[in-house]
From Swiss-Prot:
Record-listed substrate binding positions: 294, 533
Membrane topology note: Peripheral membrane protein
EC number(s) stated in the UniProt entry for this protein: 1.3.5.5
Gene Ontology process terms (BP): carotene biosynthetic process; carotenoid biosynthetic process; protein homotetramerization
InterPro entries the UniProt entry points to: Amino_oxidase, FAD/NAD-bd_sf, Phytoene_desaturase, Zeta_carotene_desat/Oxidored
Pathway membership: Carotenoid biosynthesis; lycopene biosynthesis
Gene3D superfamilies the record matches: FAD/NAD(P)-binding domain
Feature: transit peptide: 1-98
Recorded superkingdom: Eukaryota
Record-given protein name: 15-cis-phytoene desaturase, chloroplastic/chromoplastic
Source species of the chain: Glycine max
GO molecular function, one term: FAD binding
Length: 570
């Protein structure tokens, strides 16, 4: 949810802007955090100690965030299912000779694929086009030591594959769990918020029902009743019903089910923008129902956690360290220029833009779908499996970071739904995140969506529009002209193509991880998996991709032997 950014295996222009408006002005340059030189290509990652960022403009780091205990997730059906799938990789027969699998893209999908292939005894060779890990969870450090990210990343209790991954890496303590609530701004009451509080003493779905019934500020009782009646088929029909709604937009489904339009105004607009960065007139209802289904089925499903620091170091580097400890490789600055084919149409190699040729026993594309389509060989474009990808297009999104000269009071140690026409969700990261903590200054991180009309606008325009919206959320503390709280600095990160746009009738176009091209596989949240275009979906897609490769390992090994024999004859 609310994850943005992308990894690039082609010459896309990645737009990252930073404007100077005070003596704390930041650099536009991307800053490396733990890179080691490589004789073979690009940069090879090496382990690096985690250092707190230098902060000259206020007192040393001192954490006072009040977090909540990690919820009991291990006994949920989905967590057990995810743990079992992990165990199959560790228990799989050790190969006589590990397969070399070349993977394009070091976002969560590529990292997940590589991690579980390494668990199965194979050798992943991970190639990332940029000089930073993470893809849609990438982040950069400015010259002041402050981090700015591609998105505001939230980890839900209903993310069993992500939660398993944290446990397997031994980093559960890096998630800062917040109060089990959802907090919405009240547009008609500037500066005020409305809460949905989930009681710990009740099981699901009663805790969610109680939270909705107890909130009398956003929906009236008649609206709640009609909303509940509209959701009954989803509760009773389960996953088959949810999948059958793929062809309807949120608004079309509401009309069909007799749900009042105010439910969209009060709830679904905020959910749609948080889940997929678009409004409910465009979003497939399946997307909303998948989220609601998970939240209602699992007691802690809607409970949220923040990562305790920047994602490249706090999440991605532990995965890289794990992969390397099992013999895998991770290379940065290794952009794919071309997928070279054999005479039979299978992959011969990946040609990098630095001239290097990468060969393997199998190949994975774990980039965004837009990058895959750009590099798709002409010989493959007539295959229905690849033709269906045309419907899948990344959605634009903008992530905004603003450092203020004071500590804002009208905020919470939590994710907040702005219910603004321009903004989606936001958080005061100086409160919610340990690494970004500041006792004297707030740093608001905000998702600017929908962004289609703004992606080409200047950073100054985006900041001015953001400040106008913030003046409504903080009427006593922020004004658009900065006559109240003043901006010390800001960063604007634009992503022209983020997660795929989940419009109606996309589901049949999502590809399974095993392609019809022998030895070629896909990973990414756009591929077929039961979760949303999200961090959870990316991790699960990588796991399913690794599973397909392990299942095909004997075939792939035989292909490799034939290739070697042919090469020796020549």
């Amino acid at each position: 949810m609310a994850a943005c950014g992308y990894i690039s295996a082609a010459n896309f222009n990645y737009l990252v802007g930073a404007r100077n408006i005070s003596k704390f002005a930041s650099s536009d340059a991307t800053i490396s955090f733990s890179f080691g030189g490589s004789d073979s290509m690009g940069l090879t990652l090496r382990p690096a100690p985690i250092r707190a960022p230098k902060r000259n403009h206020f007192s040393p780091l001192r954490v006072v965030c009040v977090d909540y205990p990690r919820p009991e997730l291990e006994n949920t059906v989905n967590f057990v299912e995810a743990a079992y799938l992990s165990s199959t990789f560790r228990a799989s027969p050790r190969p006589l000779k590990p397969l070399n699998i070349v993977i394009a893209g070091a976002g969560l999908a590529g990292l997940s694929t590589a991690k579980y292939l390494a668990d199965a005894g194979h050798k992943p060779i991970l190639l990332e086009a940029r000089d930073v890990l993470g893809g849609k969870v990438a982040a950069w450090k400015d010259k002041d030591g402050d981090w700015y990210e591609t998105g505001l990343h939230i980890f839900f209790g209903a993310y069993p594959y992500v939660q398993n991954l944290f446990g397997e890496l031994g980093i559960n303590d890096r998630l800062q769990w917040k109060e089990h609530s959802m907090i919405f701004a009240m547009p008609n009451k500037p500066g005020e918020f409305s809460r949905f509080d989930f009681p710990e003493v009740l099981p699901s779905p009663l805790n969610g029902i109680w939270a909705i019934l107890r909130n009398n500020e956003m929906l009236t009782w008649p609206e709640k009743v009609k909303f509940a009646i509209g959701l009954l088929p989803a509760m009773l029909g389960g996953q088959p019903y949810v999948e059958a709604q793929d062809g309807l937009s949120v608004q079309e489904w509401m009309k069909k089910q007799g749900v009042p339009e105010r439910v969209a105004d009060e709830v679904f607009i905020a959910m749609s923008k948080a889940l997929n960065f678009i409004n409910p007139d465009e979003l497939s209802m399946q997307c909303i129902l998948i989220a609601l289904n998970r939240f209602l089925q699992e007691k802690h499903g809607s409970k949220m956690a923040f990562l305790d620091g920047n994602p490249p170091e706090r999440l991605c580097m532990p995965i890289v360290d794990y992969i390397q400890s099992l013999g895998g490789e991770v290379h940065l600055n290794s952009r794919i220029q071309k997928i070279e084919l054999n005479d039979d149409g299978t992959v011969k190699s990946f040609l990098l833009n630095n001239g290097k040729v990468m060969e393997g026993d199998a190949y994975v594309f774990a980039t965004p779908v837009d990058i895959l389509k750009l590099l798709l060989p002409d010989n493959w474009k007539g295959i229905p499996y690849f033709q269906r990808l045309d419907k899948l297009v990344g959605v634009p999104v903008i992530n905004v970071h603003i450092w203020f000269d004071r500590k804002l009071k009208n905020t919470y140690d939590h994710l907040l739904f702005s219910r603004s026409p321009l903004l989606s969700v936001y958080a005061d990261m100086s409160v919610t995140c340990k690494e970004y903590y500041s006792p004297n200054q707030s740093m608001l991180e905000l998702v600017f969506a929908p962004a289609e009309e703004w992606i080409s606008r200047s950073d100054d325009d985006i900041i001015q529009a953001t400040m106008t919206e913030l003046a409504k959320l903080f009427p006593d503390e922020i004004s658009a002209d900065q006559s109240k709280a003043k901006i010390l600095k800001y960063h604007v990160v634009k992503t022209p193509r983020s997660v795929y746009k989940t419009v109606p009738n996309c589901e049949p176009c999502r590809p399974i991880q095993r392609s019809p091209i022998e030895g070629f596989y896909l990973a990414g949240d756009y591929t077929k998996q039961k979760y949303l275009a999200s961090m959870e979906g990316a991790v699960l897609s990588g796991k399913l991709c690794a599973q397909a490769i392990v299942q095909d390992s004997e075939l792939l090994a035989t292909r490799g032997q034939k290739r070697m024999a042919k090469a020796s004859v020549v």
